[in-house]
Design a protein with these regions (language model features):
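Walker A/P-loop
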Residues: 38-72
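AAA+/P-loop NTPase substrate/partner-engagement loops
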Residues: 66-86
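AAA+/SF3 P-loop NTPase mechanochemical coupling elements
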Residues: 95-104, 133-150
Length: 169
């Protein structure tokens, strides 16, 4: 991929900031920064304790973009990700309460520990750059990037990632 001079400078600056926090992951840092510039998403798979979460958090801090972390456990629900509507008695109307995806960078930590329904909600937001809650469409902020981590298969509590039909086409 060819970078403009401006993008090269930005990548060098961000790489320098991230390398203050995490060492020995130069290639991973470059790949994540490339995904950031391309407004793509990243899936990092490795064994526990090697710095996956630290790397994603360092990127969030270095960019200054809005950042949220979601720890994907079996009890996380799709509405935690997308948001939900709630009745406001004082105003006598329903209001949208934003979910974790309403951020620029979402760290989806250990996504293979949550249910396929919750994974599906995240995948839809990643692909569509929007969520639909109770028939109302809510656009995600620009840029919207997901850095997802997963532990290698075989670790206790992990399950296969949901694969959509679109991925098979």
């Amino acid at each position: 991929m060819a970078y403009t001079n401006e993008n090269q400078q930005l990548m060098q600056k961000l790489s320098g900031e991230i390398s203050k926090v995490i060492k020995g992951k130069g290639e991973a840092v470059q790949l994540i920064l490339t995904a950031l510039l391309a407004q793509g998403h990243v899936l990092i798979e490795d064994v526990p304790g090697v710095g996956k979460t630290t790397l994603a958090m360092a990127l969030g801090k270095a960019t200054g973009l809005s950042f949220r972390r979601a720890q994907f456990t079996p009890d996380v629900m799709a509405s935690d990700i997308t948001g939900f509507t709630m009745f406001n008695r004082e105003e006598n109307r329903f209001e949208y309460r934003s979910g974790l995806v309403m951020t620029n960078i979402l760290l989806a930590d250990e996504i293979n520990r949550t249910s396929p329904k919750t994974q599906s909600a995240l995948l839809e937001a990643m692909e569509e750059k929007r969520v639909t809650v109770d028939g109302v469409v809510h656009q995600l902020p620009e840029p919207f990037i997901v850095i997802a981590t997963q532990n290698s298969q075989g670790y206790v509590g992990t399950c296969l990632l949901y694969t959509s039909d679109a991925a098979d086409e």
